[in-house]
Structures are given as C-alpha cells and as structure tokens.
Curated annotation (Swiss-Prot):
This is Phycoerythrobilin:ferredoxin oxidoreductase. GO terms for biological process: phytochromobilin biosynthetic process. Keywords: Oxidoreductase. The lineage of its organism: Bacteria, Bacillati, Cyanobacteriota, Cyanophyceae, Synechococcales. It comes from Prochlorococcus marinus (strain MIT 9301). InterPro entries: Ferredoxin-dep_bilin_Rdtase (IPR009249), Phycoerythrobilin_Fdx_Rdtase (IPR022827).
C-alpha cells in the first residue's frame, strides 16, 4: 500500500503536513522509494482491554539516493491515544554530514517533540561555525514559542547537537496551535537546510569515512538497544513485532 493512500496523508492525522513535506522534498532530490517488507510497510492492529479495544495503524516508508542517502525512513502511527512521526536520514558515509532526526510523539497526556541534526562524530569534527550558528539561531527562534524540555542525560545528549529542538507540551489547544505553526515552520527550515548541506557536500578521505561508519554504527546500535519507543510499540503491536521492526527496519541501513 502506498503511504499516500493511507490515513497518514489525511488531514485527521496530526502530522500529515510534516509527512507530505518530507516526501515531496525528498522526491525533488531524485530520491527513490525503497521497498519495505509488507509486514512493516503497513499494519493494522488493536490494543487495550477486551472491553475497550482500540484500533492502531502503522506505516513505514523509506527512500534511498544513489550517492547521498543510504536510507531515509519514516515510521507513522495513528491511534486514539498515540500519534507518532519518527523520521531518520542516514547519509552516505562518503560525506561528513550528521543524521537528520525527527521524533514527534503525541501521548495520551502530552506531546514529546525532538528535531535535530544528530552527530555521528564529535561536534567539532562535523559542524563548522557557520552551520552551528544557523542551527542555534533557528533553535532559539523555535524555543521562543515552544518551551524547552528538561535537560537530557549525558548518555543521551551525546547523540544530539547544540541545535536540538526538544520540547514537551501538554495536550491542549494552545499546543495544537504551536505544533501547526511554529513547529511546522521550524521543521521545514531544518529539513531545507539539511538537504541543502547534504547535497552540496564534498566527498571526504577514506580515513574520515571509516570514522563516519563507526560513528553511525555506534548511534544505530545504541538506538537498537535503548530505543525509548520500545515500551509504547510493544503495548500497541506486541513484543515480537516490535523487536523485529527495530532490528530489521528502524535502525539499519
């Protein structure tokens, strides 16, 4: 099933405009859709008690690029209690470019929002001053409207840049307004800047490529072992499917 034919392209899914912007912009750069195994590309399920069963939908969509992108994938979830857009671009390691990471999660009582150029090397080896200044300026503008969430632990923070947007909002009308307006604007600014940098980058030497491979693997292995979405996914789809999804699709190239 094409993701364009699912609920995730409809206005009643919270993140539909974000997903459309992603897919449209990646197509402009001649990215090619990557076939996802059918058991992960679309799934309907139910969760909750026998008396209060609720429906949940999941779709996984991915693309590659012949030179620039190893794998870019979106995981979308829709249910009465949860609405999720998780997106990751894994760039080709012949370019010294960070990951592009999005994790927008609507829980029963709150929204958790993360947007970043996530490093695969130490900050000083992957970000020049001009890029850091641009990111921090965009971040500060976003956080003039969206509150900054609590400080991340050192173990988690090492996988984020100084430009990370990290917010926690209550489930209320004001938050809906902030998501639809400020967050969407910041999301477009970050994605536009990322794709511009990725597609203008020059190839790096073999020594640095090896460092990039190791850095990417460290992050992907960490996420496979410590994915914070694991409990939510297990409660919605069961442990076996969740472990398979994490291992086979979410954090692999």
């Amino acid at each position: 099933m094409l993701i364009q034919d699912t609920i995730f392209y409809r206005p009643d899914w919270r993140w539909h405009n974000f997903l459309k912007y992603l897919t449209n912009n990646l197509s402009k750069y001649n990215c090619l859709e990557k076939k996802i195994p059918s058991e992960y590309s679309y799934k309907d399920s139910t969760y909750g008690s026998k008396k209060l069963k609720k429906n949940v939908n999941l779709s996984t969509w991915g693309v590659t690029h012949k030179k620039r992108i190893q794998f870019a994938r979106a995981v979308c979830i829709n249910s009465p209690n949860y609405s999720v857009l998780n997106f990751l671009i894994i760039p080709n390691t012949i370019y010294n470019v960070p990951f592009f990471g999005v994790d927008f999660v609507s829980l029963p009582n709150s929204h958790l929002l993360v947007l970043d150029f996530q490093p695969s090397l130490k900050i000083q080896k992957q970000y020049n001053n001009e890029l850091l200044e641009k990111l921090i300026k965009l971040k500060n503008h976003c956080h003039s409207s969206l509150p900054l969430a609590e400080k991340m632990s050192a173990d988690v923070a090492r996988f984020f840049s100084p430009g990370v947007i990290w917010s926690k909002l209550p489930k209320e009308e004001r938050s809906d307004f902030l998501i639809t307006n400020q967050l969407y604007t910041s999301f477009k600014e970050y994605l536009d800047l990322y794709l511009e940098i990725l597609f203008e980058s020059k190839e790096v030497n073999l020594e640095l490529q090896k460092e990039l491979i190791n850095g990417q693997n460290e992050y992907l292995n960490y996420r496979r072992d410590n994915d914070p979405a694991r409990p939510m996914l297990s409660s919605l789809f069961g442990k076996e499917f969740t472990e398979s999804l994490i291992e086979e699709v979410l954090f692999t190239t």
